[in-house]
UniProtKB/Swiss-Prot annotation:
It comes from Arabidopsis thaliana. Disruption phenotype: Reduced expression of CYP83B1. Longer hypocotyls and increased lateral root formation. GO terms for biological process: regulation of glucosinolate biosynthetic process; regulation of root development; response to insect; response to jasmonic acid; response to wounding. Transcription factor that binds specifically to a 5'-AA[AG]G-3' consensus core sequence. Enhances the DNA binding of OBF transcription factors to OCS elements. Involved in the regulation of root development. The PEAR proteins (e.g. DOF2.4, DOF5.1, DOF3.2, DOF1.1, DOF5.6 and DOF5.3) activate gene expression that promotes radial growth of protophloem sieve elements. Element of a regulatory network controlling indole glucosinolates (IGS) biosynthesis, probably by inducing the expression of accurate genes (e.g. CYP83B1). Promotes apical dominance. It is found in: Nucleus. One of its GO terms (molecular function) is DNA binding. Zn(2+) binds at C79, C82, C104, C107. Its main location: nucleus. The keyword Secreted does not apply. Residues 135-160 have a biased composition (Low complexity). Residues 121-166, 291-331 are annotated as: Disordered. This is Dof zinc finger protein DOF1.1. It comes from the Eukaryota. The keyword Magnesium does not apply.
Length: 331
């Protein structure tokens, strides 16, 4: 029947295309497919597919290099930095067979064949330690320089503080050692400490005068002759004992404060809570108009007559007291 022949021809055509036999009853019979053709050059195909692939695709890097017909390294290479032969092969960089990575044990640095040389050691410990050491030295030197500069900066201020405590003196007091017998225990000094030593010795002489010692015979003699020193000194110490030595000076007046011409208790001028006392440290008195203060007209001359070494009997006097001698004309 032509219809059956046409149907069989159609089944054969499906067999050639699908690789299976379909019977007229609807049964499908499996048929094995023909094997694939083998690659004539399997090595070339393996290199093309495995180059640049990670190692999980199968085989080690050495095996892959052998399959890629890469010759093995003949001995250790020389380091391009230090020319040391103490090197070793590490691995292929980025799983690329064209970038073998080596390590130099001499300079402890890696390098890649065909790559740039980086001067970074393994771990970077040495360079980091050197930087810390250098920074520490720099910090220590900077701190020492700051300390020295602070010391130098403090020295002028201390010098100024020291000079501010010095007292002004008359130039005639610099030669007091030549007069002798005034009992000030002065020594010839040089430099800036001269005025300071004179001031300290004069202050001690003031305190010694109040206690009745450390004074010369002419000065104490005149005071003892003209005054009843026992009662006067007791009254003076009773009133001045609670005051500091600097409270004896009147800061409000530029000249000496003379209140009475009686005994020494009146000359000190104890009035109220403040005590005015003649400063034994001779100040350079400012210019005073003679018309305004006629009683002190003779004070424009050198104070206490210290310029003439010949008059040593009553040269050092207590202004305001009854002294006999050349100094009485000042009163």
């Amino acid at each position: 029947m032509p219809t059956n022949s046409n149907h069989q021809h159609h089944l054969q055509h499906q067999l050639n295309e699908n690789g299976s036999i379909i019977s007229g009853h609807g049964l499908v019979l499996s048929h094995q497919l023909p094997p694939l053709q083998a690659n004539p050059n399997p090595n070339h195909h393996h290199v093309a597919t495995s180059a640049g692939l990670p190692s999980r695709m199968g085989g080690s890097m050495a095996e892959r290099a052998r399959q890629a017909n890469i010759p093995p390294l003949a001995g250790p290479l020389k380091c391009p930095r230090c020319d040391s032969s103490n090197t070793k092969f590490c691995y292929y960089n980025n799983y690329n067979l064209t970038q073998p990575r080596h390590f130099c044990k001499g300079c402890r640095r890696y390098w890649t064949q065909g790559g740039a040389l980086r001067n970074v050691p393994v771990g970077g410990g040495c360079r980091r330690n050197n930087k810390k050491g250098k920074n520490g030295n720099l910090k220590s030197s900077s701190s020492s320089s700051k300390q020295s500069s602070s010391v130098n900066a403090q020295s002028p201020s201390s010098g100024q503080l020291r000079t501010n405590h010095q007292f002004p003196f008359s130039p005639t007091l610099y030669n007091l050692t030549q007069l002798g017998g005034i009992g000030l225990n002065l020594a010839a000094t040089n430099g800036n400490n001269q005025a300071h030593q004179i001031g300290s010795s004069l202050m001690m002489s003031d305190l010694g005068f109040l206690h009745g010692r450390n004074t010369s015979t002419p000065m104490t003699g005149n005071i003892h002759e003209n005054n009843n020193n026992n009662n006067n000194e007791n009254n003076l110490m009773a009133s001045v004992g609670s005051l500091s030595p600097f409270a004896l000076f009147d800061p409000t007046t530029g000249l000496y404060a003379f209140q009475n011409d009686g005994n020494i208790g009146n000359n000190v001028g104890i009035s109220g809570s403040s005590t005015s006392m003649v400063d034994s440290r001779v100040y350079q008195t400012p210019p005073v108009k003679m018309e305004e203060q006629p009683n002190l007209a003779n004070l424009s001359r050198p104070v206490s007559g210290l310029t003439s070494p010949g008059n040593q009997t009553n040269q050092y006097f207590w202004p305001g007291s009854d002294f006999s001698g050349p100094s009485n004309d000042l009163l």
